[in-house]
Amino acid sequence: MKLHATSTQQYQTVTGYDDSGVEINAVHYSRSLLVMPETPPVDWPVSSFDALNAQDFAQIEAANPDVVILGTGARQRFIHPKLIAALTARRVGVEAMDNQAACRTYNILMAEGRRVALALILETPAA
């Protein structure tokens, strides 16, 4: 689904998504990534929701967001509180939702000027 007809270069905007991945400023990504409004997307070494660990969230914490939108794949899944304890201790909100909802929510919060991180899990097929 295309979200925006044109991309913005000032901020990292989700411009589309489908089953094969996500577009950030019209660039297609097919691997898990972290997106913040003012910095280019970075790889996030998460192959599946079940593979998440506390170290994966340390990478997000280093970006110093106010809120984290976690895209859990094709369906919404809930994260164990111990995995996000460091973020919670810093009063960083973490919301888990399916990838499509996560992309839309990120764009809304980004447009509001919030310091939001999109942590998107794009599952890697088993080899």
Predicted feature locations:
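C-terminal structural segments of small proteins and small subunits
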Residues: 93-122
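Short glycine-/small-residue-rich flexible loop motifs, especially phosphate/cofactor-binding loops
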Residues: 19, 84, 106
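Non-catalytic interface/targeting segments
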Residues: 1-52, 63, 111-127
